[in-house]
Curated annotation (Swiss-Prot):
Complex and partners: Interacts with ZFHX3, MLLT3, MLLT1, HSF4, EP300, TES, EIF3C, MTMR6 and PSMA6.
Positions bound to Fe cation: H167, D169, H252
One Gene Ontology molecular-function label: broad specificity oxidative DNA demethylase activity
Similarity comment text for this entry: Belongs to the alkB family.
Residue ranges of every copy of the Fe2OG dioxygenase domain listed in the record: 148-272
Extent of the signal sequence: none
Role noted for this protein: Dioxygenase that mediates demethylation of actin monomethylated at 'Lys-84' (K84me1), thereby acting as a regulator of actomyosin-processes. Demethylation of actin K84me1 is required for maintaining actomyosin dynamics supporting normal cleavage furrow ingression during cytokinesis and cell migration. In addition to proteins, also demethylates DNA: specifically demethylates DNA methylated on the 6th position of adenine (N(6)-methyladenosine) DNA, thereby regulating Polycomb silencing.
Keyword Endoplasmic reticulum in record: no
Reaction it catalyzes: an N(6)-methyl-2'-deoxyadenosine in DNA + 2-oxoglutarate + O2 = a 2'-deoxyadenosine in DNA + formaldehyde + succinate + CO2; N(6)-methyl-L-lysyl-[protein] + 2-oxoglutarate + O2 = L-lysyl-[protein] + formaldehyde + succinate + CO2
Protein name listed in UniProt: Alpha-ketoglutarate-dependent dioxygenase alkB homolog 4
Residues binding 2-oxoglutarate, per UniProt: R263
Residues recorded as bearing N-acetylalanine in the entry: A2
Cofactor binding, note field: Binds 1 Fe(2+) ion per subunit.
Length: 300
């Protein structure tokens, strides 16, 4: 029965507008995204040990780097047993078709971001299986006071050509930290700067943190921002946190070529200051928090 349901889903897609997946490209003879958009020319790899983005090996930018703040990567955040149980419980509920070959499950209020309006609309909280995960987040520096009010589960599949286009998450409702738990397979999150202009690079003779600090003295090369892409390798069962510049000044995306096997991602979002104590919608924010942290929710 499950296999038949999957075959049925493979014949459908949720793409709208310019978005495409393998299914609609084959059925409607649409061009895949890489025939429309050129790949970035200046590729960097994020190094979690230094917090810098370094030019890809073998490229013209090898040996050059720049600081890339606002990224925290926590490996082995859940155990293999916890991962299997979380995905099993997710699969007990229906997945809805979404854009670009993804499927999704939403636990959160119904939001109209364009009109900046929201309503509870049946939102009863985050799922029970996330309670221990959220509690564990509070044990890590920078997440001690993290209180998510929304969880979005996304299912990526190479058979559907799943991907997600470069985008910035909303900042009217959602707060400073975006927290994503990566399950079932590793992937790459691709970051691109929003601002025009040039990006200054420093010589990066080695991957030692002290060498990176020394290289701050003399930026000696620049590259156009519109050609820059930073690849963050996200291992299976790891937690990725984006804050600051990485949250607000760099778009994030996942390219189709980086989905090698089924990948499930649970992204947790907190409230912005407008919905926190002292904000003009603090009462609504308190209602959302109370519902979310009851951990009694089903997908809405």
């Amino acid at each position: 029965m499950a296999a038949a349901a999957e075959v049925s889903l493979l014949q459908e897609c949720g793409c709208k507008g310019i978005r495409t997946c393998l299914i609609c490209e084959r059925q409607r003879h649409r061009d895949p995204p890489w025939q429309i958009c050129l790949q970035k020319k200046c590729c960097f790899l994020y190094c979690p040990d230094t917090g810098w983005a370094a030019g890809a090996e073998g490229s013209d930018l090898e040996g050059w780097a720049f600081p890339f703040p606002g990224v925290t990567l926590i490996q082995d955040f859940v155990t293999p047993e916890e991962e299997a149980e979380m995905v099993r419980l997710m699969d007990c509920d229906p997945w809805k078709l979404s854009q670009s070959g993804r499927k999704k499950q939403d636990y959160g209020p119904k939001v109209n971001f364009r009109k900046q309006k929201l309503k509870m609309a049946g939102f009863q909280g985050l799922p029970g299986f996330s309670q221990k995960v959220v509690q564990r987040m509070g044990l890590y520096p920078g997440l001690e006071d993290f209180q998510p009010v929304e969880q979005c589960n996304l299912d990526y599949s190479p058979e559907r050509g799943s991907a997600i286009d470069p985008h910035l998450d909303d900042a009217w409702l959602w707060g400073e930290r975006l927290v994503s738990l990566n399950l079932l397979s590793a992937t790459v999150v691709s970051m691109s700067p929003e601002a025009p202009g040039s990006l200054l690079l420093c010589s990066a003779p080695s991957v030692r943190p002290d060498a990176f600090e020394d290289s701050l003295v003399a930026p000696s090369r620049s590259v156009p921002c519109q050609e820059v892409e930073v690849a963050i390798t996200v291992p299976r069962r790891s937690l990725l946190v984006l804050t600051g510049a990485a949250r607000h000044q760099w778009t994030h995306a996942i390219h189709r070529r980086h989905i090698k096997a089924r990948r499930v991602c649970a992204t947790f979002r907190e409230l912005s200051s407008e919905f926190l104590p002292g904000g003009k919608q603090q009462e609504l924010g308190q209602e959302l928090l109370q519902a979310a942290l009851s951990f009694q929710g089903r997908p809405v």
